[in-house]
Curated annotation (Swiss-Prot):
Cytoplasmic side: 1-21, 81-101, 176-377
Sequence ranges on the Extracellular membrane side: 43-57, 123-154
Subcellular location: Endoplasmic reticulum membrane
GO cellular component, as recorded: autophagosome; endoplasmic reticulum membrane
UniProt-recorded name of the protein: Stimulator of interferon genes protein
InterPro entries per UniProt: STING, STING_C_chordates, STING_C_sf, STING_LBD, STING_TM
The keyword Membrane is assigned to this record: yes
Annotated binding of 2',3'-cGAMP, by residue: 206, 272, 278-279, 303
Keyword Membrane: yes
Subunit structure: Homodimer.
Any Pfam family the entry gives: STING_TM
């Protein structure tokens, strides 16, 4: 099956990334170290090997410390900007401003590694070591000194250490991670948290209290209490383009008019947001299969997705179409994680993804039959 055809034409829903990058970086670092030191071990002899070890240690320590100082200087620039907003953003707390600006991942490892590399740097730059590293050993033979300071083998080894090993170690220590300040700036600038916020709002503002009561509302409605082929779940419709007509029967998603509105359940009454006994009811639909046998279910669109659609067509547009497509996947994944984490909601819903060019009746019939098999219907 082509990826574009998966999930009823909705497309592939990517899995969450696993945190395997540090493992791959560790393997890469080990390989680089082995290659660098093996290459010089093969091409050098006697005291040259000791000088090579000091030279490589000195080169790497210097490169790492240079990067660390540069990163700290960059964070100082960020702090200078945050200090201008210390009253409005941090309630005048200098400590909070410093913590958000100078926060690093893997703090303990960073401290130990920095201390270690500083010791190596000093040791490599001692009178005996530095002279052999930078100036060459005065007692070495001329051809040995030349090979040590300007030979291709030495230059190649230093290149491997500086260009390959340092970035891997920097990544492992979390120095490339964004600070909390930068994450906040990115979210404010590019609306990166839109889908997550919509999913949480949908859950706390609606699904959290209607899903646990769904079956009770069906049982209270005499018209639907004894219906056969009634899968007692809420089927939440998620079209890939985030758009739909207000009515399901006869819409573009129901070209053959196979979906029929049968009525509403008895309402759930809940005082909320200052509205006394607000009513929450659900619409029940009938869908006929190829044998003209009726199936019944509760369907409704994930209404927060209309916000993503409106943002993608607004002028000036806050989201491009590509960003909207990415956000709907984030919404789907986040909503599924939230609902699966709530035991009261488990087994009471189905997320139905589909492409606008699919017949919703066919999509729903497959879902209904699969759900009936799952519950042993």
């Amino acid at each position: 099956m082509r990826r574009a055809e998966e999930n009823n034409g909705f497309g592939t829903i990517p899995k969450r990334r696993n945190q395997h990058t540090p493992f791959y970086a560790s393997i890469g670092m080990i390989v680089v170290i082995i290659v660098a030191f093996t290459s010089y071990h093969i091409t050098s002899y006697g005291d040259d090997r000791n000088r090579a070890m000091r030279q490589y240690s000195f080169t790497f320590s210097l490169a790492y410390l240079a990067f660390l100082v540069g990163e700290l200087l960059r964070r100082c620039c960020l702090f200078a900007e945050e200090y201008r907003h210390i009253e409005t953003r941090y309630n005048g707390s200098l400590k909070k401003a410093i913590q958000t600006t100078f926060s690093f991942g893997h703090n303990n490892v960073l401290f130990v590694a920095s201390l270690l590399f500083f010791v190596v740097f000093v040791a490599s730059n001692d009178p005996n070591g530095s002279s052999s590293v930078i100036q060459g050993n005065s007692t070495a033979e001329p051809h040995t000194e030349m090979r040590q300071t300007s030979g291709w083998q030495g230059l190649w080894g230093q290149f491997i250490i500086s260009a390959l090993l340092t970035p891997l170690v920097v990544h492992l220590l979390g120095l490339r991670e964004l600070s909390k300040v930068e994450e906040s700036q990115l979210n404010e600038k590019e609306n990166k948290n839109v889908a997550d916020g919509l999913a949480w709002s949908y859950y706390f503002g609606y699904l959290k209290f209607v899903l646990p009561e769904l079956e009770k509302q069906i049982e209270k409605t005499s018209k639907f209490r004894s219906k056969e082929k009634f899968v007692k779940k809420m089927f939440i419709l998620i079209p890939s383009n985030c758009f739909w007509d207000d009515k399901i029967p006869g819409s573009d998603y129901d070209p053959q008019n196979r979906i029929t509105f049968e009525g509403n359940t008895e309402p759930l009454e809940k005082t909320r947001g200052g509205v006394f006994l607000r009513h929450y009811k659900h619409s029940v639909y009938e869908i006929k299969d190829g044998e003209n046998e009726p199936w019944f279910c509760i369907m409704e669109y994930a209404t927060p997705l209309l916000t993503l659609y409106d943002m993608s067509v607004a002028q000036p547009g806050e989201l491009s179409r590509e960003e909207r497509d990415a956000q709907v996947v984030v919404f789907l994944r986040k909503l599924q994680d939230i609902l699966e984490g709530d035991r009261a909601c488990q087994g009471k819903y189905e997320l139905v993804t589909f492409s606008p060019d699919r017949d919703l009746a066919d999509v729903m019939l497959r879902k209904l039959k699969d759900s009936e098999l799952e519950i042993g219907g």
